[in-house]
């Protein structure tokens, strides 16, 4: 049965799931949700995600929401040799590193990066004024996070594992994609290993396909 993804291609959370599907080489049907028209608050959608947020995924009788839960589900249920990039590690030392850095992305990087993306990207789309104080505060916070990333990436090619792209890196892609088009780009470029890592993961075909779907919307 075909996997169905309900979401908005401009949503960072939806993009996270799309990248995972493309990395796993899985066929899926994309069901666009018109959030401007309140599609995410309709009863039919709330049956999939009671919080009225995108995305939601249907895999036969299984229904999921929360983007990181969905990417983990896809990675663990489709971890076979012919199903694209593994995205996870099962050896305990590598698994430990991956689990730690997944939490770092969710609790250290994402809150700060999301505020910056809102101020520097999405507010402009909605005709709202950027709060420069919020931008300055969060640029300083992001710089500290990226200092930790720089140290990590001096000893590891990727954040979650030494030599392989995992969910850790994947989860960063949507916000990186937006922030690299703003003044915040300099914070990434000032750190050599962080800059190289960004260029590497943003060049992945899965991300290019995700952007292509966004342009079609």
Curated annotation (Swiss-Prot):
Coiled coil: none annotated. It is found in: Cytoplasm. Residues 91-217 form the GST C-terminal domain. GO terms for molecular function: glutathione binding; glutathione transferase activity. It comes from Silene vulgaris. It holds the Pfam family GST_N. Belongs to the GST superfamily. Phi family. PANTHER family: GLUTATHIONE S-TRANSFERASE F6-RELATED, GLUTATHIONE S-TRANSFERASE RHO. One of its GO terms (biological process) is glutathione metabolic process. This is Glutathione S-transferase. Residues 2-82 form the GST N-terminal domain. It catalyses: RX + glutathione = an S-substituted glutathione + a halide anion + H(+). InterPro entries: Glutathione-S-Trfase_C-like, Glutathione-S-Trfase_C_sf, Glutathione_S-Trfase, Glutathione_S-Trfase_N, GST_C, GST_Phi_C, Thioredoxin-like_sf. Glutathione binds at residues 11, 40-41, 53-54, 66-67. Keywords: Cytoplasm, Transferase. Its main location: cytoplasm. Conjugation of reduced glutathione to a wide number of exogenous and endogenous hydrophobic electrophiles. Its EC number is 2.5.1.18. One of its GO terms (cellular component) is cytoplasm.
């Amino acid at each position: 049965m075909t996997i169905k993804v309900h979401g908005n291609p401009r949503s960072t959370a939806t993009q996270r799931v799309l990248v995972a599907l493309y990395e796993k080489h899985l066929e899926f049907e994309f069901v666009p949700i018109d959030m401007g028209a309140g599609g995410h608050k309709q009863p039919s959608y709330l049956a999939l995600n009671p919080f009225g947020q995108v995305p939601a995924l249907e895999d036969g009788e299984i229904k999921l929401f929360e983007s990181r839960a969905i990417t983990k589900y896809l990675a663990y249920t489709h971890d076979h040799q012919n199903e694209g990039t593994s995205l996870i590690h099962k050896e305990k030392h590598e698994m430990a590193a991956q689990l730690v850095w997944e939490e770092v992305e969710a609790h250290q990087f994402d809150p700060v990066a999301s505020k910056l993306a809102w101020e520097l990207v999405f507010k402009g789309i909605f005709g709202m004024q950027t709060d420069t104080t919020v931008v300055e505060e969060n640029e300083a916070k992001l710089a500290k996070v990226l200092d930790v990333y720089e140290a990590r990436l001096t000893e590891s090619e990727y954040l979650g594992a030494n030599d392989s792209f995992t969910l850790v890196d994947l989860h960063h892609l949507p916000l990186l994609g937006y922030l690299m088009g703003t003044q915040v780009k300099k914070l990434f470029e000032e750190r050599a290993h962080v800059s190289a890592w960004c260029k590497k993961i943003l060049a992945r075909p899965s991300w290019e396909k995700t952007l292509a779907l966004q342009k079609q919307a």
